[in-house]
UniProtKB/Swiss-Prot annotation:
<dbReference type="InterPro" id="IPR004276">
    <property type="entry name" value="GlycoTrans_28_N"/>
</dbReference>
<dbReference type="GO" id="GO:0030259">
    <property type="term" value="P:lipid glycosylation"/>
</dbReference>
<comment type="function">
    <text>Cell wall formation. Catalyzes the transfer of a GlcNAc subunit on undecaprenyl-pyrophosphoryl-MurNAc-pentapeptide (lipid intermediate I) to form undecaprenyl-pyrophosphoryl-MurNAc-(pentapeptide)GlcNAc (lipid intermediate II).</text>
</comment>
<dbReference type="Pfam" id="PF04101">
    <property type="entry name" value="Glyco_tran_28_C"/>
</dbReference>
<feature type="binding site">
    <location>
        <begin position="10"/>
        <end position="12"/>
    </location>
    <ligand>
        <name>UDP-N-acetyl-alpha-D-glucosamine</name>
    </ligand>
</feature>
<feature type="binding site">
    <location>
        <position position="196"/>
    </location>
    <ligand>
        <name>UDP-N-acetyl-alpha-D-glucosamine</name>
    </ligand>
</feature>
<keyword id="KW-0132">Cell division</keyword>
<keyword id="KW-0573">Peptidoglycan synthesis</keyword>
<dbReference type="GO" id="GO:0009252">
    <property type="term" value="P:peptidoglycan biosynthetic process"/>
</dbReference>
<dbReference type="InterPro" id="IPR006009">
    <property type="entry name" value="GlcNAc_MurG"/>
</dbReference>
<feature type="binding site">
    <location>
        <position position="301"/>
    </location>
    <ligand>
        <name>UDP-N-acetyl-alpha-D-glucosamine</name>
    </ligand>
</feature>
<keyword id="KW-0961">Cell wall biogenesis/degradation</keyword>
<keyword id="KW-0808">Transferase</keyword>
<comment type="similarity">
    <text>Belongs to the glycosyltransferase 28 family. MurG subfamily.</text>
</comment>
<feature type="binding site">
    <location>
        <position position="166"/>
    </location>
    <ligand>
        <name>UDP-N-acetyl-alpha-D-glucosamine</name>
    </ligand>
</feature>
<keyword id="KW-0133">Cell shape</keyword>
<dbReference type="GO" id="GO:0051991">
    <property type="term" value="F:UDP-N-acetyl-D-glucosamine:N-acetylmuramoyl-L-alanyl-D-glutamyl-meso-2,6-diaminopimelyl-D-alanyl-D-alanine-diphosphoundecaprenol 4-beta-N-acetylglucosaminlytransferase activity"/>
</dbReference>
Length: 371
Protein backbone atom coordinates (compact mmCIF):
# COMPACT_ATOMS: atom_id res chain seq x y z
CA UNK A 1 0.00 0.00 0.00
CA UNK A 2 1.13 3.57 -0.70
CA UNK A 3 0.32 6.25 1.88
CA UNK A 4 0.77 10.01 2.04
CA UNK A 5 0.97 11.71 5.43
CA UNK A 6 0.68 15.44 5.92
CA UNK A 7 0.60 17.68 8.96
CA UNK A 8 2.97 20.11 10.56
CA UNK A 9 3.94 23.39 12.10
CA UNK A 10 4.29 21.92 15.60
CA UNK A 11 5.29 18.57 17.04
CA UNK A 12 1.68 18.05 18.10
CA UNK A 13 0.71 17.61 14.44
CA UNK A 14 3.90 15.87 13.27
CA UNK A 15 4.37 13.11 15.85
CA UNK A 16 0.94 11.48 15.49
CA UNK A 17 1.65 11.17 11.76
CA UNK A 18 5.07 9.67 12.43
CA UNK A 19 3.62 7.21 14.95
CA UNK A 20 1.34 5.87 12.23
CA UNK A 21 3.94 6.07 9.46
CA UNK A 22 6.39 3.97 11.52
CA UNK A 23 3.82 1.19 11.84
CA UNK A 24 2.99 1.16 8.13
CA UNK A 25 6.68 1.17 7.21
CA UNK A 26 7.17 -1.97 9.32
CA UNK A 27 4.44 -3.62 7.26
CA UNK A 28 6.44 -2.86 4.10
CA UNK A 29 4.18 -0.06 2.89
CA UNK A 30 5.52 2.91 0.92
CA UNK A 31 5.34 6.29 2.67
CA UNK A 32 5.57 9.88 1.42
CA UNK A 33 5.33 12.81 3.82
CA UNK A 34 4.24 16.15 2.37
CA UNK A 35 4.90 19.14 4.62
CA UNK A 36 5.72 22.81 4.61
CA UNK A 37 9.00 24.09 3.21
CA UNK A 38 9.31 26.22 6.35
CA UNK A 39 7.90 23.92 9.04
CA UNK A 40 9.49 21.88 11.80
CA UNK A 41 8.53 18.76 9.84
CA UNK A 42 11.12 19.60 7.18
CA UNK A 43 13.86 18.66 9.65
CA UNK A 44 12.14 16.00 11.77
CA UNK A 45 10.62 13.80 9.05
CA UNK A 46 13.81 13.09 7.02
CA UNK A 47 15.68 12.42 10.28
CA UNK A 48 13.13 9.66 10.95
CA UNK A 49 14.02 8.12 7.59
CA UNK A 50 10.91 9.05 5.58
CA UNK A 51 10.74 10.57 2.11
CA UNK A 52 9.76 14.22 2.47
CA UNK A 53 8.45 16.70 -0.08
CA UNK A 54 7.90 20.34 0.84
CA UNK A 55 5.25 22.67 -0.56
CA UNK A 56 4.52 26.38 -0.22
CA UNK A 57 1.89 27.22 2.39
CA UNK A 58 1.09 30.02 4.81
CA UNK A 59 -1.27 30.14 7.80
CA UNK A 60 -4.45 32.16 7.39
CA UNK A 61 -4.65 35.19 9.70
CA UNK A 62 -7.28 34.74 12.41
CA UNK A 63 -8.79 38.12 11.54
CA UNK A 64 -9.25 39.90 8.23
CA UNK A 65 -5.98 41.62 7.35
CA UNK A 66 -3.69 42.54 4.47
CA UNK A 67 -1.95 39.18 4.96
CA UNK A 68 -5.02 37.19 3.89
CA UNK A 69 -4.43 37.67 0.15
CA UNK A 70 -0.76 36.63 0.33
CA UNK A 71 -1.72 33.58 2.44
CA UNK A 72 -4.35 32.54 -0.09
CA UNK A 73 -1.92 33.02 -2.97
CA UNK A 74 0.83 30.99 -1.33
CA UNK A 75 -1.55 28.22 -0.25
CA UNK A 76 -2.96 28.13 -3.79
CA UNK A 77 0.53 27.44 -5.11
CA UNK A 78 0.89 24.75 -2.44
CA UNK A 79 -2.36 23.14 -3.62
CA UNK A 80 -1.01 22.93 -7.20
CA UNK A 81 2.28 21.47 -5.93
CA UNK A 82 0.43 18.93 -3.77
CA UNK A 83 -1.76 17.88 -6.69
CA UNK A 84 1.33 17.19 -8.83
CA UNK A 85 2.99 15.18 -6.05
CA UNK A 86 -0.14 13.07 -5.55
CA UNK A 87 -0.50 12.36 -9.27
CA UNK A 88 3.10 11.21 -9.39
CA UNK A 89 3.05 9.09 -6.19
CA UNK A 90 -0.48 7.66 -6.69
CA UNK A 91 -1.29 6.92 -3.01
CA UNK A 92 -4.01 4.54 -1.89
CA UNK A 93 -4.91 6.85 0.99
CA UNK A 94 -3.93 10.30 2.32
CA UNK A 95 -3.83 11.04 6.06
CA UNK A 96 -3.84 14.58 7.48
CA UNK A 97 -2.98 15.27 11.11
CA UNK A 98 -3.66 19.00 11.20
CA UNK A 99 -1.75 22.22 10.80
CA UNK A 100 -2.20 24.55 7.85
CA UNK A 101 -0.06 22.43 5.50
CA UNK A 102 -2.58 19.57 5.67
CA UNK A 103 -5.30 21.74 4.08
CA UNK A 104 -4.10 21.91 0.46
CA UNK A 105 -2.73 18.35 0.50
CA UNK A 106 -5.88 16.66 1.81
CA UNK A 107 -8.13 18.83 -0.35
CA UNK A 108 -6.10 17.99 -3.47
CA UNK A 109 -6.43 14.28 -2.61
CA UNK A 110 -10.18 14.49 -2.00
CA UNK A 111 -10.75 16.27 -5.32
CA UNK A 112 -8.77 13.51 -7.06
CA UNK A 113 -11.08 10.92 -5.42
CA UNK A 114 -8.26 9.51 -3.29
CA UNK A 115 -9.55 8.15 0.06
CA UNK A 116 -8.73 10.56 2.88
CA UNK A 117 -8.56 10.44 6.68
CA UNK A 118 -8.05 13.42 8.98
CA UNK A 119 -7.07 13.09 12.63
CA UNK A 120 -7.92 15.78 15.19
CA UNK A 121 -5.92 15.75 18.42
CA UNK A 122 -7.73 18.47 20.37
CA UNK A 123 -11.12 18.92 22.01
CA UNK A 124 -11.60 22.02 19.86
CA UNK A 125 -10.72 21.14 16.23
CA UNK A 126 -8.20 23.22 14.33
CA UNK A 127 -9.23 25.39 11.39
CA UNK A 128 -7.73 23.08 8.75
CA UNK A 129 -9.68 20.05 9.94
CA UNK A 130 -12.94 21.99 10.31
CA UNK A 131 -12.63 23.22 6.72
CA UNK A 132 -11.64 19.79 5.37
CA UNK A 133 -14.40 17.83 7.13
CA UNK A 134 -17.02 18.04 4.31
CA UNK A 135 -14.53 16.71 1.74
CA UNK A 136 -12.79 13.81 3.51
CA UNK A 137 -13.72 10.13 3.70
CA UNK A 138 -13.25 9.59 7.46
CA UNK A 139 -12.61 11.74 10.54
CA UNK A 140 -10.69 10.37 13.54
CA UNK A 141 -10.98 12.16 16.89
CA UNK A 142 -8.98 12.00 20.08
CA UNK A 143 -11.75 13.59 22.19
CA UNK A 144 -15.40 12.56 21.83
CA UNK A 145 -16.53 16.13 22.66
CA UNK A 146 -14.80 17.46 19.54
CA UNK A 147 -17.61 16.05 17.38
CA UNK A 148 -20.00 18.89 18.29
CA UNK A 149 -17.77 21.32 16.39
CA UNK A 150 -18.43 19.51 13.09
CA UNK A 151 -21.60 19.84 11.04
CA UNK A 152 -24.15 17.04 11.26
CA UNK A 153 -23.29 15.47 7.91
CA UNK A 154 -19.58 15.35 8.79
CA UNK A 155 -20.37 13.63 12.11
CA UNK A 156 -21.43 10.51 10.20
CA UNK A 157 -17.76 10.04 9.22
CA UNK A 158 -16.40 10.27 12.77
CA UNK A 159 -14.66 7.55 14.78
CA UNK A 160 -13.16 8.07 18.24
CA UNK A 161 -9.65 6.63 18.07
CA UNK A 162 -7.52 8.41 20.65
CA UNK A 163 -4.13 9.88 19.80
CA UNK A 164 -1.46 7.58 18.28
CA UNK A 165 1.77 7.19 20.25
CA UNK A 166 5.16 6.30 18.78
CA UNK A 167 6.08 2.75 19.72
CA UNK A 168 9.45 3.64 21.19
CA UNK A 169 7.78 5.97 23.72
CA UNK A 170 5.94 2.95 25.07
CA UNK A 171 8.89 0.54 25.05
CA UNK A 172 11.98 2.56 26.14
CA UNK A 173 13.16 1.55 29.63
CA UNK A 174 14.12 3.88 32.49
CA UNK A 175 17.67 2.48 32.41
CA UNK A 176 18.02 3.31 28.70
CA UNK A 177 16.72 6.83 29.29
CA UNK A 178 19.09 7.48 32.20
CA UNK A 179 22.07 6.24 30.18
CA UNK A 180 21.31 8.34 27.10
CA UNK A 181 20.58 11.51 29.08
CA UNK A 182 23.60 11.14 31.35
CA UNK A 183 21.50 11.03 34.52
CA UNK A 184 22.15 9.12 37.75
CA UNK A 185 20.03 6.30 39.17
CA UNK A 186 18.09 6.52 42.41
CA UNK A 187 16.90 10.12 42.05
CA UNK A 188 13.60 11.82 41.28
CA UNK A 189 13.51 13.24 37.76
CA UNK A 190 11.42 16.18 36.60
CA UNK A 191 10.78 16.75 32.89
CA UNK A 192 9.95 20.35 31.95
CA UNK A 193 8.87 21.38 28.45
CA UNK A 194 6.45 23.71 26.74
CA UNK A 195 5.85 21.78 23.54
CA UNK A 196 7.98 21.99 20.40
CA UNK A 197 7.91 25.82 20.46
CA UNK A 198 8.88 26.19 24.12
CA UNK A 199 7.07 28.34 26.70
CA UNK A 200 8.62 31.59 27.92
CA UNK A 201 6.56 31.81 31.14
CA UNK A 202 7.48 28.27 32.16
CA UNK A 203 11.15 28.96 31.41
CA UNK A 204 11.08 32.09 33.58
CA UNK A 205 9.38 30.28 36.47
CA UNK A 206 12.00 27.54 36.31
CA UNK A 207 14.78 30.03 37.16
CA UNK A 208 13.43 30.19 40.73
CA UNK A 209 13.32 26.38 40.82
CA UNK A 210 16.97 26.09 39.82
CA UNK A 211 17.97 28.52 42.54
CA UNK A 212 15.92 26.73 45.21
CA UNK A 213 16.82 23.13 44.32
CA UNK A 214 20.51 23.67 43.45
CA UNK A 215 21.69 21.83 46.58
CA UNK A 216 19.04 19.09 46.45
CA UNK A 217 21.02 15.91 45.78
CA UNK A 218 17.87 13.82 45.30
CA UNK A 219 16.52 15.73 42.30
CA UNK A 220 17.41 15.91 38.59
CA UNK A 221 15.75 18.19 36.03
CA UNK A 222 15.46 17.76 32.25
CA UNK A 223 14.39 21.13 30.85
CA UNK A 224 13.58 21.61 27.15
CA UNK A 225 13.42 25.37 26.66
CA UNK A 226 12.43 25.54 22.99
CA UNK A 227 14.80 26.81 20.30
CA UNK A 228 13.84 30.47 20.65
CA UNK A 229 14.45 30.77 24.38
CA UNK A 230 17.45 28.50 24.93
CA UNK A 231 20.24 31.10 24.92
CA UNK A 232 18.10 33.49 26.96
CA UNK A 233 17.57 30.85 29.67
CA UNK A 234 21.29 30.00 29.81
CA UNK A 235 22.23 33.68 30.04
CA UNK A 236 19.67 34.32 32.76
CA UNK A 237 20.99 31.41 34.82
CA UNK A 238 24.62 32.53 34.43
CA UNK A 239 23.73 36.07 35.51
CA UNK A 240 22.21 34.61 38.69
CA UNK A 241 25.31 32.53 39.41
CA UNK A 242 23.72 29.29 38.26
CA UNK A 243 25.92 28.26 35.34
CA UNK A 244 24.27 24.98 34.15
CA UNK A 245 27.65 23.49 33.25
CA UNK A 246 28.47 23.42 36.98
CA UNK A 247 25.28 21.60 37.96
CA UNK A 248 25.27 18.08 36.53
CA UNK A 249 21.78 17.41 37.92
CA UNK A 250 20.36 19.91 35.42
CA UNK A 251 20.04 18.91 31.76
CA UNK A 252 18.97 22.04 29.86
CA UNK A 253 18.44 21.63 26.11
CA UNK A 254 16.62 23.57 23.40
CA UNK A 255 14.87 20.47 22.06
CA UNK A 256 15.02 16.69 22.30
CA UNK A 257 14.22 14.52 19.30
CA UNK A 258 14.35 11.36 21.44
CA UNK A 259 11.51 12.25 23.81
CA UNK A 260 11.18 8.57 24.70
CA UNK A 261 14.31 8.93 26.88
CA UNK A 262 12.82 11.83 28.85
CA UNK A 263 9.43 10.16 29.33
CA UNK A 264 11.11 6.92 30.42
CA UNK A 265 12.89 8.60 33.36
CA UNK A 266 10.31 11.23 34.37
CA UNK A 267 8.67 10.98 37.80
CA UNK A 268 6.87 14.30 37.25
CA UNK A 269 6.20 16.37 34.13
CA UNK A 270 5.73 20.15 33.93
CA UNK A 271 4.11 20.93 30.60
CA UNK A 272 1.64 23.07 28.67
CA UNK A 273 -1.40 20.97 27.70
CA UNK A 274 -1.12 20.10 24.02
CA UNK A 275 -3.07 16.95 23.19
CA UNK A 276 -0.18 14.97 21.71
CA UNK A 277 2.07 15.56 24.72
CA UNK A 278 -0.77 14.66 27.08
CA UNK A 279 -1.42 11.45 25.15
CA UNK A 280 2.24 10.51 25.56
CA UNK A 281 2.31 11.47 29.26
CA UNK A 282 -0.81 9.44 30.10
CA UNK A 283 0.28 6.46 28.01
CA UNK A 284 3.36 6.35 30.27
CA UNK A 285 1.35 7.11 33.42
CA UNK A 286 3.32 10.18 34.56
CA UNK A 287 1.91 12.71 37.06
CA UNK A 288 1.85 16.27 35.74
CA UNK A 289 1.75 19.95 36.58
CA UNK A 290 0.02 21.58 33.61
CA UNK A 291 0.13 25.24 32.58
CA UNK A 292 -2.23 25.52 29.57
CA UNK A 293 -1.32 27.95 26.79
CA UNK A 294 -3.97 30.67 27.22
CA UNK A 295 -4.20 31.69 23.56
CA UNK A 296 -4.88 28.25 22.05
CA UNK A 297 -7.83 28.09 19.66
CA UNK A 298 -11.07 27.70 21.59
CA UNK A 299 -8.98 27.58 24.79
CA UNK A 300 -8.61 23.86 24.04
CA UNK A 301 -5.46 23.45 26.13
CA UNK A 302 -7.25 24.38 29.34
CA UNK A 303 -10.01 21.92 28.46
CA UNK A 304 -7.36 19.23 27.87
CA UNK A 305 -5.67 20.03 31.19
CA UNK A 306 -8.87 20.11 33.24
CA UNK A 307 -9.79 16.62 32.05
CA UNK A 308 -6.57 15.29 33.61
CA UNK A 309 -7.08 17.38 36.74
CA UNK A 310 -10.61 16.01 37.16
CA UNK A 311 -9.26 12.46 36.93
CA UNK A 312 -6.63 13.17 39.58
CA UNK A 313 -3.72 12.84 37.14
CA UNK A 314 -2.57 16.47 37.12
CA UNK A 315 -2.53 19.81 38.91
CA UNK A 316 -3.40 22.82 36.74
CA UNK A 317 -1.92 26.31 37.11
CA UNK A 318 -3.26 29.11 34.93
CA UNK A 319 -0.54 30.82 32.89
CA UNK A 320 -1.48 34.20 34.40
CA UNK A 321 -1.00 32.76 37.91
CA UNK A 322 2.33 31.03 37.25
CA UNK A 323 5.07 32.32 39.56
CA UNK A 324 8.44 30.82 40.36
CA UNK A 325 7.79 30.51 44.11
CA UNK A 326 4.43 28.83 43.45
CA UNK A 327 6.03 26.25 41.16
CA UNK A 328 8.82 25.60 43.68
CA UNK A 329 6.28 24.96 46.46
CA UNK A 330 4.21 22.60 44.31
CA UNK A 331 7.22 20.61 43.09
CA UNK A 332 8.50 20.21 46.65
CA UNK A 333 5.08 19.07 47.91
CA UNK A 334 4.74 16.43 45.20
CA UNK A 335 8.31 15.13 45.25
CA UNK A 336 8.13 14.69 49.03
CA UNK A 337 4.74 12.98 48.97
CA UNK A 338 5.32 9.57 47.43
CA UNK A 339 1.77 8.36 48.06
CA UNK A 340 0.21 11.34 46.29
CA UNK A 341 2.62 11.05 43.37
CA UNK A 342 1.87 7.34 43.02
CA UNK A 343 -1.88 7.96 43.10
CA UNK A 344 -1.54 10.63 40.38
CA UNK A 345 0.57 8.23 38.29
CA UNK A 346 -2.12 5.56 38.55
CA UNK A 347 -4.80 8.05 37.50
CA UNK A 348 -2.65 9.18 34.58
CA UNK A 349 -2.14 5.59 33.43
CA UNK A 350 -5.90 4.94 33.51
CA UNK A 351 -6.42 7.88 31.15
CA UNK A 352 -3.82 6.65 28.66
CA UNK A 353 -4.77 5.14 25.30
CA UNK A 354 -1.68 3.21 24.18
CA UNK A 355 -3.89 1.20 21.78
CA UNK A 356 -4.91 4.30 19.77
CA UNK A 357 -2.30 3.67 17.08
CA UNK A 358 -3.75 0.25 16.23
CA UNK A 359 -7.29 1.65 16.11
CA UNK A 360 -6.20 4.31 13.62
CA UNK A 361 -4.22 1.83 11.53
CA UNK A 362 -7.37 -0.29 11.13
CA UNK A 363 -9.40 2.79 10.20
CA UNK A 364 -6.84 3.88 7.59
CA UNK A 365 -6.63 0.39 6.06
CA UNK A 366 -10.42 0.13 5.87
CA UNK A 367 -10.61 3.58 4.26
CA UNK A 368 -8.00 2.65 1.65
CA UNK A 369 -10.00 -0.49 0.79
CA UNK A 370 -13.21 1.51 0.49
CA UNK A 371 -14.93 -0.25 3.39
Amino acid sequence: MKLVFTGGGTGGHIYPALALAESFRKKGDEILYIGSNDGLERRIVPEEGFDFQGIEVAPFPRNLSVHLFSSLLKTGRGFIQARKLLRKFKPDVVIGTGGFVSGPVVLAAALQKIPTVIHEQNAYPGLANRLLAPFVTRIALNFKEADRHFKEKAREKIEITGNPIRERILTTSREEGLLNLGLRKGKKNILVFGGSQGAKNINEAMIACYRYFKNNSKLQIIHLTGMRNYQEVLQDLKEKGLDPSKYTQYKIMPYLDNMEWAYAVADLVIYRAGATGLAEITAKGIPAILIPYPYATGNHQEHNARSLEKAGAAIVIKDSELKGHKLVKLIEELINDGKRLKKMAQSSKRMGKPWARNTLINLIEDTAKGS
